[in-house]
Structure formats: C-alpha cells, structure tokens
C-alpha cells in the first residue's frame, strides 16, 4: 500500500495546500489575457448538433489554430447534451501543446463554473500547466484538491511536479520527490529520470546527473535516446568532452545507436574547444555507422575549419554537403563568408553571398556585417554603404557592431563627416554607442588633425556614461602628442595615473615619445627611469624611443650608455635601433 502523498511536499507547502482547500473551486489564478469572446459565434455554430465537434476532435486537432480551439470550446459548452470530460480533455491537451498554458487554466476554471467535473486526466493537464508557468505552489494546491476528491496522483502527475521543481530552482525538492515516489510505491519511468537529469544539469550538478544514469540501470529503467541526448548535451555545454565520449561508448554497449543530434552536439563541442581533428574523426565515424549528417553537423565543422584557416577541408565539406542535397543554411554561409573576409578573399565572399540569394536564403545581420567589414578593409566604402542601405531596406536593422565597422571605415579613409553622420543616425535609431564607437571617432578626428572635436567626443563619451578604456586613453594621448598638445596630454596622463586603470607599455611609449619630440628629453628620461619602480619592463620600442630622443638632443654619450643597458637587459636591438 502506498504511503501518503503529503510526504512529498515540505511543511510550508503543505500549509499552502491546506489553506487552498478550505473553499470550493480551483486555486486562485490570474485572469487569462486571452479573449474568449469568439466562443459566442462558435456556440451558435455548434448548437445544431453534436456530431461536428466530435468530428473535429477526432480528425482536426493536430492542425488547429488557437482561435479555432477557443471557438470549439465555446461550441462544446453550449452543445446539448454536453460532451464528455474525455472530449474536453482532448481539446485542453491540444491547447496545452500550443504552450498556451494560461488559456488552458482559464478554460479549466470555466468548466468548473459550468458544473463540468474534472477527472484525473484533467487535473494532470492543469497541474502540468501550472508547473510550466512556474506556479508550483498553485500546482500543489490543485494536487491537494484533487486528492481530497479521491483521485490518487499518477506517475504523470508527479512527473509534472518534478518538471516544475526542476525549472523553478528547487532541485533539492525535485531529488527528494523522486526518492519519495519510490518509497510510495511508484516506479519512476524513463521520462521521470530524464526530467530530473535535465534539472540537475540546469543547476550545475553534472556529476549527480551522470550518476543518475547508472542508478536508472540499477533500478531496471533503461535510459533511452532522449536521456542520453540530455546528458551528452549537458556535458558538452560544460566542456566535459571526455565524459561525453564515455557516454557514447556506454550507449554502444547498451546497443542504443546515437542519432545525428547527439553526434552533432559532440562535434560542435569538439569544434568549440579546438579539437577540430577529433571532430572530423567523429564525423567520419558517424558516417561509417550509417548516421547521415545534417545541416547543423556540417555548419559546425565548416565554421570550425574556417576559424583555423583550413580552407580546403571546409570547401570539401561544403561540396560534399551540396552533393548530398543537404541545403546549407544562413549559419553555414555566414561561417564561410566571415572566414573569407578575414582572409582577405572578398571576391570569394561576394560569390557566396550571390549563391545565398540564388538559393533564396535571406542574409542576416551577421552576413551583412561581415561583407560591410570586407568592403571597408578593401577601401570600397561606397559599396560598404550600399550594402548597409540594402540591409536596412530588407528590414534587417544594423546593430552597434555594424555601425562601428562602417564608422571605422570612413574614419580611416579620412571621411570623418560621413562617420559622424552615421553616429548621429545610430543615435536616432535608439542605439547607444559603446567604447569602440567613441574611440573610433576620437581617432578619426585626430587623423583629420581636428584636436578640438576629438576632445569634444571624449567629453561627450564621459557625459553619456560610456566608460573609456585604456585603448581610448592611448588614442587620446597619442593624438594630442602627435598634434603638439603635450600639455593637454600630460593632464590626461596624470588623470589616468590617478585612476584605477593601469597604463600599458604602449601608453608610456606614447608619453616618452611625445616628451622627446617636444624637446623635453629630461622629462622623458625621468618617466623612463620610473618604469622599473612601477614594475614595468621597457621593451625594444621604448628603448628605441628614448635613444632617438637622446640623439635628437645631441646627447650621444647618454644614447650609447642606454644602448649598452638595452643589450644587458635583454631586449634585442632591431632595425629601428
């Protein structure tokens, strides 16, 4: 005989259930936001007979739209005699599969008001909906009501609660529930264990999840393909690839054949963790076992191979993919286009873009951004701007990265006005420039020898709450020094030193070079000598800068002495020395 279900819930939850059982009716729920007015029309449509709704329930639920389902319910409640609870359950189940959980709960409440009594299956549907909405307390209250009416919870009921616990950050309750289910005489099935395993991974309890697979087998519950898929996916997300491989071996020993989803998951993980050869070997193994790769398998591998500049392997896979009539998707094309752009092979990238269009594959923001970057890299700014405008015309709106790419292109080409115009347009679209945006504009104004506007952009950046990084400061200091504004650069440098941000070796070189070129070699030498006190080891560039400063000032002995020190300290002189 099974022990009481009350042991399943904590004392706090039990009190909640008890309070909700004091009155009649369902637990209190928020009103549904779904408009049920459509029931009126359907009520009239079904009032003539009962055969119509039965025909739809029998044949038409799999393709039914939400409005039709609402209308069908309206017709059913007005039909006389009333449909059976089994027929209502069939409709509620169909709506639940549409993930309209709040609507199912509202319809269940309406049934109660109309005097249509729920059965165990109805309660299971409603409890599942509460759990899916993360309203576990209401699910438990309904469980209590159901039991008071004499319904014993089934494994389905408890599995729904388990799922609710797992997704409601109550994993300890989920584990306790499974243990108590066993004590109560229930036999957890594969779905129950798989749900708990998924929950354990959600809460970063990978070792417990893997151990549970062995526990399943010990209890005579054989893990299925879905179970193994959940475990493999969880392990791969954590980077535990060796454990994932061990699991593949366990599957093989249990005569459970891994499917394309499981293989693709492991291959993708191998790619992300830079094991491209292992990924290719596993790809070959899956083919040898008769598992046909899909577009996701190919896309992961192609993207990985492109990242490691293995063009011939990537091209071979693309050809193989097309030959097998597996259509590349936007992810596949994006990986290749981005790789070709970074390699400087813009012609090949454009050909792939044309191929996408021929195949009626819509480019996305990554496609356009990669091509815009390619055009900018090759100083084809008008084509980059055209691609940018085409992107917007296709309702694919640029993000901050896209704008930054184009602004940088115009700034490098000394077309700063167009870069500023893009910055304004970006703000009008509600996008906030980031550190890269402002730093790019500062650099662009300095290139145009417009120090005032460069400093204005820096002030606006701070005013807008965008934090400068060391790259921003280096750009500002370099621009001021090269444009003869050493005094202003010194103010910025002193502020930087007082801040929590650490200057880089490049920062010090900028200042030493600026001081030397401004004739303040002694100040440059003082800063150079302070580096060792700051724990900064001078590199060959700083030595060259300081030696050049001494030479420019005619201090040959000091230059020779520093050259000897350079050779003693380790940085090898280069052609600049």
Swiss-Prot record:
Q: Which organism is it from?
A: Arabidopsis thaliana
Q: What is this protein called?
A: Pentatricopeptide repeat-containing protein At1g63400
Disulfide bonds listed in the record: none
Ranges of the PPR repeats in the UniProt entry = 49-83, 84-118, 119-153, 154-188, 189-223, 224-258, 259-293, 294-328, 329-363, 364-398, 399-433, 434-468, 469-503, 504-538, 539-573
SUPFAM superfamilies recorded: HCP-like
Superkingdom of this entry's organism?
Eukaryota
Matching InterPro entries: Pentatricopeptide_rpt (IPR002885), TPR-like_helical_dom_sf (IPR011990)
The similarity annotation says: Belongs to the PPR family. P subfamily.
| Keywords associated with the record | Repeat
């Amino acid at each position: 005989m099974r022990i009481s279900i009350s042991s399943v819930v904590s004392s706090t939850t039990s009190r909640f259930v008890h309070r909700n059982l004091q009155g009649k009716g369902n637990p209190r729920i928020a009103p549904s936001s779904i408009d049920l007015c459509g029931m009126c029309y359907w009520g009239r449509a079904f009032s003539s007979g009962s055969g119509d709704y039965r025909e739809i329930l029998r044949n038409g639920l799999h393709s039914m739209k939400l409005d039709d389902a609402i209308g069908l319910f309206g017709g059913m409640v007005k039909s006389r005699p009333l449909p059976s609870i089994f027929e209502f359950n069939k409709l509620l189940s169909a709506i639940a599969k549409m993930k309209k959980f709040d609507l199912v709960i509202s319809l269940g409440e309406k049934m109660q008001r109309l005097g249509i009594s729920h059965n165990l299956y109805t309660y299971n549907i409603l409890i599942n909906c509460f759990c899916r909405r993360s309203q576990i307390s209401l699910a438990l209250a309904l469980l209590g009501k159901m039991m008071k009416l004499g319904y014993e919870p089934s494994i389905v009921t408890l599995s729904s609660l388990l799922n609710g616990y797992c997704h409601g950050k109550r994993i300890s309750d989920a584990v306790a529930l499974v243990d108590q289910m066993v004590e109560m005489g229930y036999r957890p099935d594969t779905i129950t264990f798989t749900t708990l395993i998924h929950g354990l991974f959600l809460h970063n309890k990978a070792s417990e999840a893997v151990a549970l697979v062995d526990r399943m087998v010990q209890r005579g519950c054989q893990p299925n393909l879905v179970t193994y898929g959940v475990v493999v996916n969880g392990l791969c997300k954590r980077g535990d690839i060796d454990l994932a491989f061990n699991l593949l071996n366990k599957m093989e020993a249990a005569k459970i054949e891994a499917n394309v989803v499981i293989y693709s998951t492991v291959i993708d993980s191998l790619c992300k963790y830079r094991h491209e050869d292992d990924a290719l070997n596993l790809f070959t193994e899956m083919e040898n076992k008769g598992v046909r790769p899909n577009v996701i398998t190919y896309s992961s591998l192609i993207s990985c191979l492109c990242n490691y500049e293995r063009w011939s392997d990537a091209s071979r896979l693309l050809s193989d993919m097309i030959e097998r009539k597996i259509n590349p998707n936007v992810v596949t094309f994006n990986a290749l286009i981005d790789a070709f752009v970074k390699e400087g092979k813009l012609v090949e990238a454009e050909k792939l873009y044309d191929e996408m269009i021929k195949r009626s594959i819509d480019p996305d923001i990554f496609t356009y951004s990669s091509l815009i970057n390619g055009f900018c890299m090759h100083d084809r700014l008008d084509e980059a701007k055209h691609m940018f405008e085409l992107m917007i015309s296709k309702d694919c709106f640029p993000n901050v990265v896209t704008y930054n790419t184009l602004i940088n292109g115009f700034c490098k080409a000394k077309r700063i006005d167009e870069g500023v115009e893009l910055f304004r347009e970006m703000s009008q679209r509600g996008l906030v420039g980031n550190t890269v945006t402002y730093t790019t504009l500062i650099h662009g104004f300095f290139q145009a020898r417009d120090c005032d506007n460069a400093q204005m952009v820096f002030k606006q950046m701070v005013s807008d709450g965008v934090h400068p990084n060391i790259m921003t400061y280096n750009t500002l200091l370099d621009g001021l020094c090269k444009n003869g504004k050493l005094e202003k650069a010194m103010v910025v440098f002193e502020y930087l030193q007082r801040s929590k941000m650490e200057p880089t070796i490049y920062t010090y070189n900028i200042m030493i070079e600026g001081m030397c070129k401004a004739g303040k070699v002694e100040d440059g030498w003082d800063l150079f000598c302070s580096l060792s006190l700051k724990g900064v080891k001078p590199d060959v560039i700083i030595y060259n800068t300081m030696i050049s400063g001494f030479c420019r000032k005619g201090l040959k002995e000091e230059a020779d002495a520093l050259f000897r020190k350079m050779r003693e300290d380790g940085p090898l002189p280069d052609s600049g020395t």
